[in-house]
From Swiss-Prot:
GO terms for biological process: ubiquitin-dependent protein catabolic process via the N-end rule pathway. It catalyses: N-terminal L-glutamyl-[protein] + L-leucyl-tRNA(Leu) = N-terminal L-leucyl-L-glutamyl-[protein] + tRNA(Leu) + H(+); N-terminal L-aspartyl-[protein] + L-leucyl-tRNA(Leu) = N-terminal L-leucyl-L-aspartyl-[protein] + tRNA(Leu) + H(+). This is Aspartate/glutamate leucyltransferase. The keyword Kinase does not apply. It holds the Pfam family ATE_N. Gene3D superfamilies: 3.40.630.30. The keyword Transferase applies. It is found in: Cytoplasm. It comes from Helicobacter hepaticus (strain ATCC 51449 / 3B1). GO terms for molecular function: arginyl-tRNA--protein transferase activity; leucyl-tRNA--protein transferase activity.
Amino acid sequence: MRLVEFYSEKKVCSYIDSKQSIFRYFHIQNVTPSFYYGLLERGWRRFGNYFFTPMCEGCTDCISIRTLIDDFTFSRNHKRLLKKAQNIDIYIQKPTITQAHIELYNRYHRVMRDKKGWEYTPTTPESYMDMFVEGHQDFGYEILYFIDSQLVGVGLVDALFDSITAVYFYYDHTFAHHSLGTLNILKQIQIGKENGLKYFYPGYWIKDHYCMGYKQRFTPFEVLKNIPDVFEAPIWEMYNG
């Protein structure tokens, strides 16, 4: 395992315009599942061979959370959505790249640029490989969603020991009425239940945020209370509102 540490440049936060963000990165070739799991427990996320965590000055709004899978109960609306999804073909496999992936990814981000002001640069096959295919090893998977043989959603996930963690999800907004984002989270929790997993990590949460607040709907969940370094113990506590 080879690790290179670096920091991003300070820039305007993608989620709170009045603040600036900076991230600590590890670039790790051939990461071991146990080392990755240790990072995950300490609030790190993964894209490709890159692992990162926010280190923003004077701000801790991005909170690492994890849903308790065994204690999660599917609501009536959740069950209705899962039943409705029986008409959607869902496949789980190792991460791949096709022209359909690239086109869907770029379509999704064009919409998000217009809808929420996201920065948009069309991805290339090389960039997509670097961020979503490389580094998946034995723990990385993609969940593919098809409607009438058309790729309409891609969920990248990692499964590590007792946990499943959402890496990224993008979808076709033409099919937004299928609530694909919520469906993708429910499928991951469902997979966790079926495989006896303990935690679902949905990524960073900003309470009541227009873009990041939705994660608080999947309860019960724990929050990471400290900002531990790599060899410091993480402190997780149940969130009570």
